[in-house]
Each structure stands twice: as C-alpha cells, then as structure tokens.
C-alpha cells in the first residue's frame, strides 16, 4: 500500500461514521497530513451540516501548518453553493498546496468542476487513489445520480431446498431468520431510504418494516395495493412511519404520514415506481418481498445488490424462492452458525457502480 493509499484508506474509515445520516449527500472522509503526520481528520456527519473537508480543517490546531500540508479526501471537493459553501473554495482560501482525491463526484453540479477549480488556483491535484473502494462506498449516491433511480437491494431468506415460506392463507410466516440475521436485516433497513413489499406480504405478515432491532431512522415504507383492498388496521397504516401506497385508485381516508400514489397498472409498474422514488429523492430501496415482487425485479434486471440468507432447513414444499439464470458476482459470505448470508451483485451491473 502506497502512502496515498494509506491516507485515503483512513478517509474511507472516517466516512463510514456517517452511514445512515448523510443521505441524500454521500459519505465522505478527509485527512490532513503534514510531513507524514496526520494533523486533522473529519467526515460528513449528516446532511445540511459541514462537509468532511471543513471538519478536517477545523480539527487542525495550528492552521499555519496547512500551507505545507496535503489534504486527502475520498470524494472530489464540491465547487457549488448548496446548503454549505464550496469546499474547493475553503481549500484554496487556506492555501493547502496539494489535494489527493479518491474519486470524482458524479453529481452534475460538481462532476470535475471542483478539481478544475483547485488546479486553476495552482494546487497540485491527484485523482483516483483507491478509486474502486471510494466508488463502492458511495454506490447508492452514484446509482441515483447516473441511472436516475434508487440503488436497489433485494433481501430474502430461503431453505436449503429453495423455499421462502410455507403455503398459507393466514397465520404467521415460518421463521427462517435467527436473532442475529434478523438484527442484520434491521441494520440494512436503517441503511436504506425506503423499503418495499407487495400486497400479499403486507396482508399475511402485517409487517411494521421498522428498525426496532437496530438504531437509526426508519425507512419510508412502500406497499403495492392496486385495488386498495388492504385492511386499514394493518401496521403499515398506523401513521407512525411515512408510508407510500402505490395504487390505481384514489384514497378514501388519507392521513399526513400515508401518501397514495396512482400508477398505470396496464403498464409495467416498476419503472413508474422508480420514477416516483427518483423525484422524491429516495436514493436507496430495500425490497423484502414477497417472492413474486422480488422475481419481477430480477427479471427486469432492476437490482444492484442482494442479501440471501441460506437456512439449514428443508421445507419440501411451499413458496419458491426467487431464481435467476444469470450469474451472480459473489461478494462475500457471512456465517451465523450453520446459516449463511450471501451478499451478491448481478455480474452485468457491478461495472456500473464499483469500477
């Protein structure tokens, strides 16, 4: 690992501290180095507050050292006025002579302009250090800004013989997840802006779709209810968490936290849902079920990541798990006793985000 890679790696570590809090902004970390000694660090804590570069500069006790220092940042410094002033201007103002950047910012108001501004000011700029790792960190932000849709994560648990539930018209679903994997699912919920289920899952499971087993915000809850036949006493309509209902009808009893959105069900509704979520600035979507809904995303090649829990249990029959003839690019396996959580990307889409 080179010196630049070492400090950008530290930027990535810092950036992760902003997980669940920065959206719709990306997670960013920054490190300031004076003669091979770190004199300042910072990360973007939450949207609307100071960016990583600002926090790193503020942490330096002797600002006179900045004139002989290098600032490392995982993402290109911004060059526009948003909720905060441009970071590129602050770097220029503090006369920091060198900037090392992990990856360029895909956001249209930046997209190389920060780098250009720094270079025009006579600052030495290096770009592309640990670029793949830096892009992976902000994969949700990149997908949203380049593909104009949320980053989509699929999640399900299945038995060894490929079923996600027993055949039923009521009662509780069969419990496949253990307490540890259930907690991991709630962590994933906290990391996403929204969570989607179909009508059958909402009716039979009556899920809260909350993060009760993990700290952090609740995602916006999404449910497809074409004919508005779901009972109003379901947990989804409790009014405690923001909920979108996709339907072809007009609502009967709207409330402040339940929004009804009309779709054209004579056409494919997934692109319509993606457009709605993009307009509402929802950058990441977790799809939890059921099997038909998950399969529709797979068949449409409309997913970026999947978490598949393999459970050492044989059901023999029931609701079949989603399947795909396409090859997965396996990222890693997480073991919980005899259970395995597979984290995978569709091979044809990995290049769009990470490379």
PLM segments and residue spans:
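N-terminal pre-triad scaffold of radical SAM enzymes
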Residues: 69-79, 147-158
């Amino acid at each position: 690992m080179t010196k630049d890679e070492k400090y950008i790696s530290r930027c990535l570590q810092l950036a992760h501290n902003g997980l669940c809090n920065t959206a719709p902004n990306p997670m960013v970390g920054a490190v300031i180095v004076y003669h091979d000694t770190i004199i300042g660090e910072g990360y973007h804590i939450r949207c609307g507050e100071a960016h990583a570069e600002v926090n790193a500069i503020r942490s330096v006790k002797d600002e006179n050292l900045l004139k002989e220092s290098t600032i490392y940042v995982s993402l290109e410094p911004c060059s526009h006025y948003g909720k905060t002033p441009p970071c590129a201007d602050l770097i220029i103002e503090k006369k920091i002579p060198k900037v090392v950047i992990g990856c360029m910012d895909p956001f249209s108001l930046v997209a190389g302009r920060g780098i250009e501004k720094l270079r025009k000011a006579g600052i030495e700029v290096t770009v592309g250090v640990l670029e793949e790792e830096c892009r992976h960190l902000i994969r949700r932000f990149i997908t949203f800004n380049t593909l104009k849709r949320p980053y989509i994560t699929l999640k399900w648990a299945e038995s060894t013989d490929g079923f996600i539930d027993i055949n039923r018209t009521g009662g509780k679903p069969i419990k496949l997840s253990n307490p540890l994997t259930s907690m991991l699912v709630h962590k994933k919920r906290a990391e996403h802006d929204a969570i989607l289920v179909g009508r059958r899952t909402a009716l039979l499971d009556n899920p809260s779709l909350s993060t009760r087993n993990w700290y952090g915000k609740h995602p916006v809850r999404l449910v497809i209810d074409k004919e508005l036949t779901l009972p109003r006493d379901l947990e989804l309509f409790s009014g405690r968490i923001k909920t979108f209902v996709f339907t072809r009808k007009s609502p009967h009893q709207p409330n402040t936290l339940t929004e009804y959105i009309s779709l054209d069900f004579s056409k494919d509704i997934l692109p319509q849902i993606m457009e709605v979520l993009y307009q509402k600035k929802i950058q990441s979507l977790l799809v939890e079920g059921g099997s038909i809904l998950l399969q529709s995303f797979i068949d449409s090649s409309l997913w970026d990541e999947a978490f598949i829990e393999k459970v050492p249990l044989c059901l023999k029959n029931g609701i079949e798990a989603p399947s795909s003839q396409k090859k997965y690019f396996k990222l890693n396996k997480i073991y919980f006793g005899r259970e395995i959580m597979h984290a995978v990307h569709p091979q044809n889409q990995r290049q769009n985000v990470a490379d």
